């Protein structure tokens, strides 16, 4: 069974259209490390993007490899500085 992580990014007002193309580039890089996006939604009321990512195997090790990768570093070049906050947590299925 895959491990699932929930992520919520709070974006500066009016900047979601700037952030989403950058976020999609990072998702492409994560997928190269075996991650899969379970869902992703924009909460327009709170200007958040809420998403879940899963990985089979050792999530923490794969995430560390991804975070320290040259692919991720390259994707971060020119990143818009529009995130106000991040919340991250591991998920447990209830239904």
Regions found by a protein language model. Name each.
Residues 92-93:
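Specificity-determining recognition surfaces
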Residues 18-42, 54-89:
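An amphipathic, aromatic/His-enriched active-site/gating alpha helix that lines ligand/cofactor pockets
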Residues 1, 6-7, 47-60:
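Accessory recognition modules or surfaces
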Residues 2-18, 33:
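Surface-exposed interaction/gating patches
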């Amino acid at each position: 069974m895959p491990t699932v992580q929930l992520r919520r990014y709070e974006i500066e007002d009016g900047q979601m259209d700037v952030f989403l193309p950058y976020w999609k580039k990072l998702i492409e890089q994560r997928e190269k490390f075996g991650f899969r996006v379970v869902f992703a939604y924009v909460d327009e009321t709170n200007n958040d993007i809420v998403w879940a990512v899963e990985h089979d195997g050792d999530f923490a090790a794969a995430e560390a490899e991804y975070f320290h990768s040259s692919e991720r570093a390259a994707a971060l070049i020119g990143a818009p500085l529009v995130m106000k906050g991040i919340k991250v947590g591991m998920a447990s299925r209830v239904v």
